[in-house]
Amino acid sequence: MTENDVIIASEGGLGRITLNRPKALHALTRDMCDKIIAAVHTWEVDPAIAAITIDHSEGRGFCAGGDIRLLFESLQNEDGAALGFFYAEYRMNHLLFTLRKPSVCFMDGIVMGGGAGLAMPCRHRVATESTAFAMPETGIGLFPDVGGGWFLSRLPGRIGQWMALTGARLNGADCLALDLATHYLPREALSDVKMHIGKHPEALENILQVAKDEPPPSVIGQLREKIDRLFAADRIEDIVAALEADTSLWAAEQLGEIAKKAPVSCKVALQQLVRGHGCTRFSDNMMMEYRIVSRLIRKPDFIEGVRAFVIDKDNCPHWMPQHFDEVTSDEIEAIFAPLPEHEEWAPLGRD
């Protein structure tokens, strides 16, 4: 990590946040979250700042999520830094969600986990032909956090549940079709659009509207009927049964993906989306997600998931437990239960 992991700059009425860890696919750290929080706080009350942009400096990914290798090391050392990261990250998500000034995130390249958490709260979200959007956390023993309980549960039909359980990747056209993105631009147009916004930040919305392009056809519409029918249940056992009863290759592929995921994480994710959809305030959703993450990072699955896919890279995690029917409803309820008052998450500033 260096002082330049995130570049914070303001000029001519525009606040710029540029992620700058290309070798790590711009994975987020606690320090990066703290810097973004400080900048947004300052710019929100500065009358000279008309708009805020979020992008990345270079490379094939906007943001691959939180730096799970650092989280792994923190949990191994039992130094408490992992939980501190999530506390700060969720405050950053909430601050961007409640921001009153126009903001735009350029979702060019990989947008996963914490990257989605940076992008989704922004008023404008620009996808490109290189966008690869996913919430793959159930595959490493976690759950689709950073506001996933809010925005996944509000996607059409059962697309959010499908994404949470399979880690499915969406392209830029899919993101636009689902309102995960508000605009679609070819990658080659981004530099000119950013230049125009830099010169006229007060005209951000008009600049994006004029520059937007028509994406190629989205394939997500072709899958809607299958997704809504086969992922209709809120119990993972019922979803698996529906997929097993279907004879299509697509259903078999979804079963294969779900089989790779941590059973506890899958059950948590489905319940998270049920409860997240019922939240009337984003802060309530984030408080729920902090309760979840504070429990899940202490369970063996997260350590095992990172070991299998990041550290040893044998791609063979041994989940505990290994089967869905071994995860009890009492265990899930305990994961969602309130924390002691002094340990609860709270937003910065307004709710």
What feature does the model see in each segment?
Residues 180-261:
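Amphipathic alpha-helical blocks and their helix-capping loop/short-beta junctions
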Residues 1-55, 80, 94, 347-351:
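Conserved CoA-thioester-binding segment of acyl-CoA-metabolizing enzymes
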Residues 54, 67, 118-119, 174-175, ...:
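Hydrophobic/aromatic residues within transmembrane alpha-helices
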Residues 149-158:
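Hydrophobic, secondary-structure "cap" segments at the distal end of domains
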Residues 96-140, 162-168, 172:
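Glycine-rich beta-to-alpha active-site loop
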Residues 56-91, 139-141, 335:
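Glycine- (often His-adjacent) and acidic-residue-rich active-site loop
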Residues 122-144, 179-194:
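Gly/Pro- and small hydrophobic-enriched strand-loop and loop-to-helix capping segments
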Residues 292, 300, 304-351:
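C-terminal amphipathic alpha-helical interaction region
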